[in-house]
Every structure is written in structure tokens, then in C-alpha cells.
Amino acid sequence: EETIHRGRFLRIQRASFVAPDGERFERDIVRHPGAVAVVPVTAAGGVLLVRQYRPAVDRWLLEIPAGTCDVEGEPHETTARRELAEEVGCAAEALVPLIRMANTPGFCDEWTSIFLATGLSPVAHDRHGAEEVHLEVVEVPLERFDALVDDGTIVDAQTVLGVALARRHLPPAG
């Protein structure tokens, strides 16, 4: 593999492969350290989302709290708890693993671990960096979530998947 670009936390490598029929081919692969995402559900039955600007799509998105696994060797649960505190100012009594998913396996090796967080309580937090400073926390009632997906307000795939999987662990609404 040849590294053709090295960024802050991403690398792009050109790799050679041999197909089952023996044909050789190359692919550019984005190397990513992985990420975590958290579905924080309040006692009132809402999910805490963050509204933040995403330069890659030039749009403000509503997403579950998430972040890169940027501390080598740190357990994903620890990273998830840190992101929950940093982005929405909460600690979780319970953190339940929902899925470890391959985000875009056609060109990237990133895996994201998604957790359900319940038993939320406020904690002091310090947002840092341009993206986190401008976050807005929005509580969306779970019964409104699907309508926000349907109307294109929520478009982030890990948010849609995370909430869908979290619902399996929550009591029925009503």
C-alpha cells in the first residue's frame, strides 16, 4: 500500500488487489481510526440530537452525538461517554451497545460503534474546536422522529439507524 495523502486523522492509501479470476486492480482506500455514536434518550422519551454544520455536505444537520476514536487504545464505551458529555452535557447511567457498523465499506475502513444512553444526568462540559462550539442541542420526541426523517430534516444514516435500533430496547410509547 502506498500512502497518497495523510490528513489530521485520515489517510488515503492506494492498494493493489487480486480478483478471484486473477485480474489485478487498484483501489484508493480511506483509512479512518473509527468512531462512536450515542443515542441519548431522556426520561421524557425524547432523543437528544445536535445541530451542527457539516462542511462536507455544506449543510446544518441534526445528528446523534458522535466522534472519532482519537485516543489510541481507548475502549469505545469510554469514547462514547466522553462524546456524550462534550456534545450534550450529559452522563449516562446505562450505556448499551447497539451495533458496530461499517460506514462506507466501498472505499473506507471506518467502523462506528453505536450505543444507547439512558438514565441521563447533566455534567459540566467544555466544548472545544470550531465544530463543537457552535453545536445546538435539540430534544426531539421519539414520536416525531420518523416525520423528521420523512421530510428530509434528519438525513444522517447513523442517526436513523441508531434510533431505529435503540427503539428495540425502549418501552413502547404511550
Feature roles, as predicted:
Residues 11, 33-34, 54, 63-66, ...:
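Active-site segment of metal-dependent pyrophosphate-handling enzymes
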Residues 4-44:
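Acidic, metal-coordinating catalytic segment for phosphate/diphosphate chemistry
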Residues 2-5, 98:
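Local beta-strand/beta-hairpin segments that build beta-sheet-rich folds
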Residues 37-82, 99, 124, 131-132:
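Conserved Nudix-box catalytic region and its N-terminal flanking loop in Nudix hydrolases
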Residues 14-16, 40, 116-118, 139-141:
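Short, well-ordered beta-strand micro-motif
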Residues 23, 60, 97, 101, ...:
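Nudix hydrolase/Nudix homology domain
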